């Protein structure tokens, strides 16, 4: 892949008077102000820039946001350099003069570049493989190795997409490495890297923020789903067992209650039911005391005579539905009178 053709790919970059047409609210921007405009996803501008990034970047990365940089003084310096280059070669071919390339700032905050009046400063550059200069890459994947990281924990990385004046660009010679060349820029092997030797020959047009994609492992998700299903099954099974145990306990308690006997030797539940039926106050499990029974008037004449004559009327008592109650009462002090 050679230079990106500005005339075909970035036709929307055509300037209106001095500044690019794409610049927003330029009439509100003061001379000393720098605007960082977030580009809306879905806009033609966003699509063009994102495609330029994605086509030369590993698909393991994704764009977080794209911001357009609007620095008036920085742009004017770049525009003046472009005019001089055009006068030098007297060409109308925009592709010869200008290209779009990526640049990573390493540990330096990109803000130090796009908010300054100089921009990319060759005086602050270090000696690289091709001498001192401003290094730009054709591929985003190359600049990714030199990208700026906001913080180790955020995972956000940043790089510039720049407008670069290449002019007459050729592979380096020993003379050019000493920064004593008449060429406008140096072309690295394969044309994938370009080195500029003077200031104001590159403009940081966009700041691209991106990050590593979060890869979801489907196998892990499936395992987690199966694990959750098994946990639910086990929980349901445990609930079922608990309910069964509760029912068993109820049955056991019921059986225990049914097998409980009072001080008179009779089944407690049955005795209670009989007392309730006849409106009697159920005695405590203590030994009965004289007069603790409180039968109603009707029962006083129906049951008590039978109790006092139980020896003579044993057969009648046996026929009574409430035989157990009669026996209970007969063991009391009332029945012994």
UniProtKB/Swiss-Prot annotation:
EC numbers, comma separated: 2.4.2.30
InterPro entries in alphabetical order: ARTD-AVP, Poly(ADP-ribose)pol_cat_dom
One GO MF term: NAD+-protein-glutamate ADP-ribosyltransferase activity
Keywords: Glycosyltransferase, NAD, Transferase
Swiss-Prot/TrEMBL catalytic activity: L-aspartyl-[protein] + NAD(+) = 4-O-(ADP-D-ribosyl)-L-aspartyl-[protein] + nicotinamide; L-glutamyl-[protein] + NAD(+) = 5-O-(ADP-D-ribosyl)-L-glutamyl-[protein] + nicotinamide; NAD(+) + (ADP-D-ribosyl)n-acceptor = nicotinamide + (ADP-D-ribosyl)n+1-acceptor + H(+)
Keyword Transferase included in the entry's annotation: yes
Residues in the signal sequence: none
Domain PARP catalytic residues, every copy: 21-231
Low complexity: compositionally biased ranges: 218-242
Region of interest (Disordered), ranges: 218-247
Stored Pfam families: PARP
Disulphide-bonded residues: none
Protein name as catalogued: Probable poly [ADP-ribose] polymerase DDB_G0278045
């Amino acid at each position: 892949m050679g230079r990106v053709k500005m005339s075909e790919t970035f036709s929307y970059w055509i300037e209106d008077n001095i500044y690019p047409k794409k610049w927003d609210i330029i009439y509100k921007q003061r001379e000393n102000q720098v605007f960082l405009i977030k580009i809306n996803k879905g806009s033609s501008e966003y699509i063009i820039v994102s495609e330029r990034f994605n086509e030369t970047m590993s698909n393991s990365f994704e764009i977080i946001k794209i911001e357009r940089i609007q620095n008036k003084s920085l742009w004017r310096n770049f525009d003046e350099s472009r005019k001089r280059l055009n006068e030098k070669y007297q060409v109308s071919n925009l592709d010869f003069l200008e290209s779009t390339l990526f640049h990573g700032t390493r540990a330096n905050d990109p803000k130090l570049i796009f908010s300054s009046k100089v921009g990319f400063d060759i005086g602050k550059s270090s000696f690289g493989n091709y001498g001192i200069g401003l290094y730009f890459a054709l591929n985003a994947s190359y600049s990714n190795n030199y990208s700026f990281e906001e913080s180790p924990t955020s995972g956000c990385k940043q790089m510039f997409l720049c407008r670069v004046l290449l002019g007459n660009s050729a592979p380096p010679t020993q003379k050019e490495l000493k920064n004593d060349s008449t060429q406008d820029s140096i072309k690295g092997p394969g044309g994938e890297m370009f080195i500029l030797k003077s200031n104001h020959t590159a403009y940081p047009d966009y700041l691209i923020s991106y990050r590593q994609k979060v890869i979801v492992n489907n196998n892990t998700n499936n395992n987690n789903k199966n694990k959750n299903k098994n946990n639910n099954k086990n929980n349901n099974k445990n609930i079922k067992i608990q309910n069964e145990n509760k029912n068993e306990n109820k049955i056991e308690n019921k059986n225990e209650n049914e097998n409980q006997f009072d001080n008179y030797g009779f089944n407690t539940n049955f005795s209670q039911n009989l007392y309730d039926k006849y409106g009697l106050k159920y005695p405590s499990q203590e030994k009965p005391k004289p007069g603790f029974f409180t039968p109603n008037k009707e029962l006083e004449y129906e049951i008590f005579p039978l109790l006092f004559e139980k020896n003579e009327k044993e057969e009648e008592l046996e026929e009574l539905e409430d035989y157990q109650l009669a026996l209970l009462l007969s063991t009391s002090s009332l029945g012994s009178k």
